Amino acid sequence: MTITGIIAEFNPFHNGHKYLLDQAEGLKIVAMSGNFMQRGEPAIVDKWTRAQMALENGADLVVELPFLVSVQAADFFGQGAVDILDRLGIDSLVFGTEEVRDYQKIADLYTEKGAEMEKFVENLPDSLSYPQKTQSMWKEFAGLDFSGNTPNHVLALAYAKAVAGRNIKLHPIQRQGAGYHSVNKDVDFASATALRQHQKDQDFLERFMPSVALFEQASKVIWEDYFPLLRYQILSNPDLTTIYQVNQEMAVRIKEAIKTAQSVEELVELVTTKRYTKARVRRLLTYILVQARENVLPEAIHVLGFTEKGRQHLKSLKGQVNLVSRIGKEPWDAMTQKADQIYQLGKPSIAEQNFGRVPIRIETN
């Protein structure tokens, strides 16, 4: 049987995600971000709600990406997620992308010339942002051009790099309907960005979300809910460079900007430079919010939920893969657990995220 991996955020889960799961074959394993997203923001609804949405709509097994994999630039995000899925035995990786290319050929190219390609990136001037450097590399070695508004294509290239040299086939699926950041409401498939923006529009949600009731019952948060906490962390920390990935230049800019910024958005605008993209700045602010430190990634994989088919697969992995199904009895990842506690501060109604929580079981799919 084919075992298909999907790397996702489901922030929130929508019809485009359901379409992706429908296109996947065999047993479907999702490696999903926890409560903080790749581009440096809190998830609109918590990880358990999103895992349940996925399981109700075609996923067989949902596991959690640790905080220091979830909140990373595309390459590290892709690498960390593929590592986890590889250990769970996937033989193909399905992903949505704005432009379907021969990603397999790109992965093979990276297998062959990876060292040379990374050397090329290292030698580029530091005035360029990391995404600009990566794009120059792909242009140079694979003749790829970027239109700018294609974050899924950028992630797809990160996945191609991550599967290089592994026995995993890449299956790109053409992204349906609205673009990643689109807030357009007149499309067949709305983007997660649009759903977050129109979260109070009942008709809109019902048109584009398969698990509306779950979404509506869940506590919802946005970055601004954490702004007072972020501000406190910045003002009370005498040395921000002790925080993961915060260098002297960024520490100075953030300390200066917090004096006048009235919102997270304003803070991001003030700190962003040509070299430091908004996504990178948001990630740094997320690290500051949760006081992230450089840490080894957990050996074990945290299971958020499964169907009967997923349970059987987990059973077959016993003894080969270290799995955690209940945090408390077994510790998992201190960094992620701390991030979850801080996520809960966004709204008093957010449920406990770890202790005593057991995987969601969906009997039928």
Swiss-Prot record:
EC annotation from Swiss-Prot or TrEMBL: 6.3.4.-
Superkingdom: Bacteria
Alphabetic keyword roster: ATP-binding, Cytoplasm, Ligase, Nucleotide-binding, RNA-binding, tRNA processing, tRNA-binding
Job of this protein: Catalyzes the formation of N(4)-acetylcytidine (ac(4)C) at the wobble position of elongator tRNA(Met), using acetate and ATP as substrates. First activates an acetate ion to form acetyladenylate (Ac-AMP) and then transfers the acetyl group to tRNA to form ac(4)C34.
Keyword Isomerase: no
UniProt main location, coarse: cytoplasm
GO molecular function: ATP binding; ligase activity, forming carbon-nitrogen bonds; tRNA binding
Upper taxonomic lineage: Bacteria, Bacillati, Bacillota, Bacilli, Lactobacillales
UniProt name for this protein: tRNA(Met) cytidine acetate ligase
Subcellular location: Cytoplasm
Gene3D superfamilies linked: HUPs
Reaction(s) catalysed by this chain's protein: cytidine(34) in elongator tRNA(Met) + acetate + ATP = N(4)-acetylcytidine(34) in elongator tRNA(Met) + AMP + diphosphate
Name of a matching Pfam family: HIGH_NTase1
Family to which this protein belongs: Belongs to the TmcAL family.
Recorded GO CC terms: cytoplasm
InterPro entries: Rossmann-like_a/b/a_fold, tRNA(Met)_cyd_acetate_ligase
A biological process from GO: tRNA modification
Signal peptide interval: none
Residues the entry annotates as binding ATP: 7-20, 96, 152, 175
